[in-house]
UniProtKB/Swiss-Prot annotation:
PROSITE patterns: LYSM. Belongs to the secreted LysM effector family. The LysM (lysin motif) domains are small globular domains involved in binding chitin in eukaryotes. LysM14 contains one LysM domain. GO terms for molecular function: chitin binding. CDD domains: GH55_beta13glucanase-like, LysM. Residues 1291-1317 are annotated as: Disordered. This is Non-secreted LysM effector LysM15. Disruption phenotype: Leads to enhanced fungal virulence, with faster decaying on infected fruits. Activates expression of several core effector genes, such as PEX2_055830, PEX2_036960 and PEX2_108150, and a chitin-binding protein, PEX2_064520. Residues 1179-1225, 1231-1277, 1328-1375 form the LysM domain. Residues 1291-1303 have a biased composition (Low complexity). Non-secreted LysM effector that might be involved in manipulation of host defenses for successful infection. Keywords: Chitin-binding, Repeat, Virulence.
Length: 1410
């Protein structure tokens, strides 16, 4: 149709006067963090109905299964058609007023319980068509939507019930009148093909069984392996060429779904035709459909919620005529045939608000279900036609008041295209979350009319509407991939309606991204264009033939001009922060934008859109086998351990490339359930996988409940409609570990699957076990360690995922609050690409989301909520941090600030390319960023938060500086791609990597503890040898090493390893050996004199120089530093504490009047009997009183430190050797040097003509920068070697043939010694050779030649693990290969004889030997 006439005030919605609302936030992940306002932490009374909870506010009423929307106090039934028509005429006249009033005065979310009547029942609204409703019709009819109301108007009530007489009259009129669907004149499939690419419905993995194995059925796959089977189910091709509905696999199966706790005979699967629906477009099917929905005593009026009455209600193809609302009960899926969408046709006699409704008003403020608790609903694969309903009655296709775990998918809404129509597709006045995707709207006054706390919508198409979509309030909303064609107004953003039920909340935060608006008068209309009002972001969107791109309707001014065709990369209005402390109001300006990684995107309307993928419908499965797990032996009865049979079924199905159908049930698994790569799984009404049993009970030994693939798997995973849960106590349960990486974009994916910990029948975590009145932690209610772990080698596409630790009981009438303890929510370590669309994580102790060492991550609308019981106990209690990557320890929380000890909403640690679109928070701190880059946050909104964002080592972004009504909001928090946010003092290092621990047989909890980062200077990584501390003679440098945060990190590391790695070993050592040694060296190095506050090593270095401890002045011997350091060494298994130290400590105790242990301690490794050590030099010496290493070094031409290292169990200090002990003298060196004050390596190498790093090579105890050369003299002595130990590079002896070299490598190739045989396999790219003798040992050869043992063996592969016994006397071995000796491609052989070799530097011939 052509565009509507020029816009006037009448067809541009005006705005209601409202108080500034709570604004929501957007990131490249929309994050709504919602807090529980409890107790002394948040300054409100700690009672259930007193805080502002997003879900749990209930009526104290008795359960009921009321099946009908009609009033029990009905009027008499009409006896004639004419009488029925008159009743409907009057009813619809009232309907036009009442439905309009409902839109004008919508009910906002209510966070307190509503009052009851005197008899304890919920109040009942008056009946439609009564005199009460006719009062003031004339006045009410004059109200324009979104305009300010008078006090008299604001007091009107707009709820009603439908009497049975009215409903019956509507049925009679409907069946008496032709009701065929109208002619809409729109080719929806063509429009979708024009703008959106056709995508795979599913990806088929290769069938592993090439032939029957005798156990499983073999199905030959006609479709190519790893190929698409079908076009996207949302492409509406089914509307053009309909396949036979009999081909829908689900309808051909025996229905075995059951609910273990429901009454016997209860049906999960319901086909509406089996309940009397005809689907012929003539018979009124309203009653039959409602009977199909309500059958079995389900949770309806005055029930609140229930988990034991799930239902999947199936609609075969057809046209279902309805004359009053179809009521969707709690925990219900409405499923249309995906091959041929059924049509729900609203009759011309229709009475009600929504053709399908998710909630029923019983009064202006009371309904069947609390909207913020209205969980677990799905409607998909339908056409909804309201064109026949009265044009002025404001009838909608779906009245959708929902919360988490809900979705609308694959639907087409048809409305009148008359300019005067009031019809609408979706009406949503309130709620708390959900997901909507692949909806098409044709015609209507509003395609969609939205209001909700936080929501995600994707892939919406609007055609020929007056107003494509309007948002009248929210906290946070992400709209992605929206197409608007031929509408007067595209997106309308209004200020919320007024009235007695208004909270004053306006549109807080809204993102419109990857959108296309074509042929519209106004692309976007808003009156909230003002400082401290709505945060709005328009990103990567295109306008074509749009008169005005953005219109300020309050002022009647153009904010952003239209045009024939142009794109908007990033534009909006709101506060923008480019540093932690300052934000600036951007009043309709370009907003900084990220560079989207290719891996996260696909084709777009201008620049690439973020990738999306809809859940598979499996509409054309070909010869693929469908496996029903109950048919194959699984019970799903909530009692039987189904783990073994499910593991077998899933393994076989993956091998067959079959699709696994899990009928509804509760499937107990008592150990890990393995979902192999290649699995495609579909549940029914959220089939439950329930972890239970002793293997999940130990929080110190986490156990994965459902493992999706093995680490390193690449391929296909498709999971949908499952619920992962537990039966407590299960403190160690990791509900899902995701390991699979995609093989094609988005091939590893999960949709509409949720996590629930407690609060339901069968969980053993309900009111009777875990009532919130329990002030102490009930260990039986500690129920999970981690909900979802996306591991480092994986990628994931997740859509509509709700991870909920229950805060209330879903299966009791009053839905009492409970205390359930889950450690962590969602941990993302993936290196990408990973997408999180419409996800939520709530009520976990340490964090709701943590992004750790991750990259290439998109998070679109994440919502969180903290546990109600916090800050009692203080986080991380009752859990111990350190089991998983970068667990928060809350060590920086001041004990006087209780608010600090609350869970983090989101932490981004050591990550890059993280894009977040929107958030809303509530507590002292909620969002931490540490050592991360390319992180972009949009539309951040907080409530009750002191610090909006808390980057490490930076000033926080304060909510008080970004006030927006009663919220605080930031449109964009951005730094640029190369900026490091939250830069730590030290990035940190790992003592162990995961690869280095492979094959050690460590437990799943031990490895993460060992691989945690230590947040210290990298210098400390070398402190793994037992010592007495590190002295650097540089206080500034030591201050840096002794950072307090480093000590906390080391202490936490050692503590965690001790806890999680108890009774395990790494080789022959205890797991804490390296970490404990570093920590002990840190404590020694950083110990300060209690009086002078100088470092103790600085103090000791100024002590009087003496020959031995017994010669020390008493004040020095008995000083705090000297005695304490020696006591610390004695007390620690990680220290160097020798017999000499023992004698000194005994001397201290006898001289200084101290007491305490002095005995030697066991080393931190297993001591096994070994032969007496070999003295390489064959020279021993018996020590005499007064001997020092320096004295003996000069006598034997060795380095003083070499004496200590050759005798580590005897000598602990070169200045004080124990007498009468036989010690081994090391190999000598030709050139010695006695250190002088201020000497350094660089100077000595220059003065003595030595090559770079030579001194460290000859004296390997020196650290990487020779920084300990001076500081270690007291312990290691002062005599250095300036030539190799055991040999020199001269040309006068036999044994080593050489050319000059640098370190252990030679500079040029030489031929092997004449008349020698080169050992088998030894490289000829060698510049130093050694001819072995019968008495040689490998260690002697290495020491003489200056080559490391590793390089020696690599260059001479004939030397086995037992190197000494592999040596062959007379053979020549390479002891100095040239650089790149093993790079075959580098060398070009030009040999002219067996002795000629090539070299990159120079060819040389031996001129002698040493």
């Amino acid at each position: 149709m052509p565009p509507h006439p020029n816009t006037t005030k009448e067809n541009i919605p005006s705005l209601v006067k409202a108080t500034p609302g709570a604004q929501s936030l957007r990131w490249m992940l929309l994050f709504a963090f919602l807090c529980s306002l409890v107790g002394n932490a948040y300054g409100t009374h700690h009672q259930h109905h007193g805080h502002q909870h997003l879900h749990h506010q209930v009526r104290d009423v008795k359960a009921s299964a009321t099946p009908t929307v009609t009033s029990s106090s009905s009027s008499s039934l009409p006896s004639t058609l004419e009488e029925a028509k008159e009743i409907i005429k009057n009813a619809q006249a009232s309907l036009a007023v009442m439905n309009k009033g409902r839109l004008a005065y919508p009910q906002w979310n209510q966070y307190i319980a509503q009052p009851k009547s005197k008899n304890g029942t919920s109040p009942v609204a008056p009946a439609l068509g009564t005199e009460h409703l006719a009062t003031n019709h004339a006045m009410i009819a004059k109200i324009a939507l979104n305009e300010s109301k008078t006090e008299d108007q604001s007091s009107q009530k707009f709820s009603y019930t439908i009497p049975s007489g009215v409903a019956h009259a509507a049925k009679l009129v409907a069946e008496a009148s032709p009701q065929s669907p109208g002619s809409h004149g729109v080719d929806i499939a063509a429009i979708r093909r024009k703008y959106r690419p056709q995508r795979n419905d599913t990806n088929r993995p290769a069938q592993k069984y090439a032939q029957s194995n005798g156990l499983d059925g073999y199905v030959h796959a006609q479709a190519p392996m790893n190929s698409a089977l079908d076009s996207d189910s949302g492409d509406d091709e089914s509307q053009l060429t309909k396949r036979s509905s009999a081909d829908f696999w689900l309808t051909t199966m025996t229905q075995r779904g059951s609910s273990p706790y429901a009454p016997e005979g209860y049906k999960v699967w319901r086909n509406v035709k089996e309940y009397g629906a005809k689907g012929d477009g003539v018979t009124d099917d309203t009653a039959a459909i409602n009977l199909a929905v309500s059958d079995g005593g389900r949770c309806g009026a005055d029930c609140g919620s229930s988990t034991i009455y799930p239902a999947q209600v199936y609609f075969p193809p057809g046209t279902y005529l309805v004359s009053s609302p179809i009521i969707q009960y709690f925990n219900t899926e409405f499923l249309g045939n995906p091959l041929d969408y059924p049509t729900i046709l609203a009759a011309s006699s229709f009475v009600g608000l929504g053709v399908i409704t998710s909630d029923v008003y019983t009064g202006d403020t009371t309904e069947w279900y609390i909207n913020t608790n209205n969980f677990l609903r799905s409607v998909r694969n339908f056409n909804v036609d309201v064109t026949r309903t009265p044009q002025d009655a404001y009838v909608c296709g779906i009245h959708w008041q929902v919360a988490q775990g809900t979705s609308l998918e694959n639907m087409v809404f048809y409305m009148s295209q008359d300019a005067a129509t009031t019809q609408q597709g979706v009406y949503m006045e309130n709620g708390s979350g959900g997901f909507i995707t692949n909806l098409t709207f044709v015609g209507g006054n509003f395609g969609a009319y939205f209001g909700n706390q936080q929501f995600t919508t994707s892939e919406l198409t609007f055609i020929n509407a007056k107003n494509a979509l309007q948002v009248h309030w929210d906290w946070a909303w992400t709209m992605q991939d929206v197409i608007i064609e031929n509408c007067v107004n595209g997106l309308v953003i209004v200020g919320g309606a007024g009235g007695s039920m208004s909270t004053g909340q306006s549109v807080g935060s809204l993102i419109l991204m990857d959108a296309l608006i074509v042929n519209a008068t106004n692309g976007i209309v808003t009156s909230l264009f003002a400082e401290n009002s709505t945060s709005f972001l328009l990103q990567n969107s295109v306008f074509r033939d749009v008169t005005t791109a953005v219109l300020d309707s309050a002022q009647g001014t153009e904010i952003l001009a239209g045009g024939a065709a142009f794109g908007v990369e990033s534009w909006g209005f709101g506060r923008v922060a480019t540093s932690s402390t300052n934000s600036t109001f951007y009043n309709g300006q370009d907003i900084p934008v990220m560079e989207r990684p290719v891996s996260l995107t696909y084709m777009g309307y201008d620049k690439p859109n973020f990738f999306q993928r809809r859940r598979p419908a499996y509409t054309n499965i070909g010869n693929t086998q469908i496996i029903d797990v109950k048919e194959w032996g699984a019970a799903g009865d909530g009692t039987t351990n189904d783990g073994p049979i499910l593991n077998s079924i899933l393994d076989r199905a993956a091998n067959l490339s079959a699709i696994v159908f899990i009928p509804h049930g509760i499937y107990i698994v008592e150990d890990t359930l393995h979902i192999p790569v290649g699995s495609r799984i579909i549940g029914q009404a959220w089939s439950q996988i329930m972890m239970k049993g002793s293997k999940f009970e130990n929080q110190l030994k986490p156990r994965v409940g459902v493992q999706v693939g093995q680490v390193g798997d690449v391929g296909i995973i498709e999971i949908q409609s499952l619920l992962f849960t537990v039966s407590g106590p299960t403190a160690g349960a990791v509900l899902v570990e995701w390991n699979v990486h995609q093989s094609t974009q988005g091939s590893a994916a999960m949709w509409d699957s949720h996590f629930r910990v407690g609060g339901a029948k069968g969980s053993s975590l309900q009111t009777s076990q875990c009532d919130k009145s329990d002030t102490a932690v009930n260990t039986a209610c500690v129920a999970a360690s981690l909900l979802l772990h996306i591991t480092s080698q994986s990628s994931a596409y997740l859509e509509n995922i709700w991870a909920w630790t229950a805060d209330h009981d879903l299966d009791t009438t009053a839905q009492e609050q409970i205390n359930i303890y889950s450690g962590r929510g969602i941990l993302v370590e993936s290196q990408g690409p990973t997408w999180l669309y419409g996800t939520s994580s709530e009520h976990n102790v340490l964090y709701q989301y943590q992004v750790s060492n991750a990259k290439d991550l998109y998070m679109g609308m994440i919502q969180t909520e903290s546990p109600y019981f916090q800050p009692t106990p203080h986080a991380p209690q009752p859990f111990k941090a350190g089991l998983f990557s970068n667990d928060p320890v809350f060590a920086d929380c001041d004990s006087s600030s209780a608010n600090c000890f609350a869970s983090w909403a989101l932490r981004i640690i050591d990550s890059s390319s993280v894009y977040i679109m929107g958030t809303e928070d509530c507590q002292q701190r909620a969002f931490e960023i540490s050592q991360s880059t390319d992180t972009w946050i949009y539309n951040l909104v907080t409530k009750g938060i002191v610090e909006m964002i808390s980057p490490v080592n930076e000033d926080p972004t304060l909510a008080a500086n970004n006030v927006n009504g009663f919220m605080s909001s930031i449109l964009a928090w951005v730094r640029g791609s190369n900026s490091t946010i939250g830069e730590r003092t030290f990035p940190g290092f790992q003592i162990y990597t995961a690869d280095s621990l492979e094959g050690q047989g460590l437990t799943e909890s031990c490895t993460p503890a060992l691989t945690q980062k230590v947040l210290c200077s990298p210098f400390l990584k070398t402190w793994t040898s037992p010592g007495i501390g590190q002295y650097y003679k540089n206080t500034t440098f030591t201050d840096m090493l002794c950072d307090a945060g480093c000590g906390e990190s080391l202490g936490s590391y050692v503590d965690n390893v001790e806890t999680y790695c108890a009774n395990q070993t790494i080789g022959s050592s205890i797991p804490t050996r390296n970490g404990g040694t570093i920590y002990h060296n840190y404590n020694l190095t950083c110990l300060e004199d209690k009086d002078t506050k100088e470092y103790c090593l600085d103090t000791i270095m100024d002590f009087t120089t003496v020959e031995s401890a017994k010669d020390m002045p008493t004040n020095e011997l008995c000083s705090y530093c000297y005695t304490t350091m020696l006591e610390m060494r004695q007390a620690s298994i990680y220290s160097s504490y020798t017999e000499s130290d023992k004698e000194t400590l005994e001397l201290i105790q006898s001289t200084c009047g101290l007491t305490g242990p002095t005995e030697l301690h066991d080393p931190p490794y297993t001591v096994t009997p070994t032969p007496d050590p070999v003295c390489v030099s064959n020279t021993t010496y018996t020590t005499q009183p007064g001997d020092t290493c320096d004295k003996l070094a000069k006598q034997y031409s060795v380095a003083s430190a070499a004496i200590l290292y050759a005798n580590p169990t005897i000598i602990g200090n070169c200045s004080d050797l124990p007498a009468s002990r036989d010690i081994c003298m090391p190999l000598g060196c030709d050139t010695q040097y006695t250190l002088q004050d201020d000497d350094n390596c660089w100077q000595l190498q220059r003065d003595y003509g030595l090559g770079p790093d030579s001194i460290r090579q000859y004296n390997p105890w020196l650290d990487s920068d020779c920084l300990n050369m001076q500081g270690a003299r007291e312990i290691l002595g002062s005599v250095l070697c300036l030539s190799p130990q055991g040999a020199t590079h001269n040309t006068t002896g036999d044994g080593i043939t050489t050319t000059p070299g640098n370190g252990e490598y030679a500079q040029g190739v030489v031929s092997p010694p004449e008349n020698s045989t080169v050992a088998p396999g030894t490289t000829t790219k060698c510049g130093r050779w050694y001819s072995a003798t019968a008495d040689d040992l490998c260690v002697q050869i290495c020491l003489k030649s200056g080559v490391s043992a590793k390089l020696f063996k690599a260059a001479n592969p004939s030397l086995a693990a037992d190197c000494d016994n592999s040596l062959i006397a007379g053979d020549a071995y390479c002891v100095g290969p040239v650089p790149r000796w093993n790079d075959t491609a580098y060398w070009i052989e030009t040999a002219t004889s067996s002795k000629a070799v090539s070299t990159p530097l120079a060819s040389a011939k031996a001129t002698g030997s040493v």
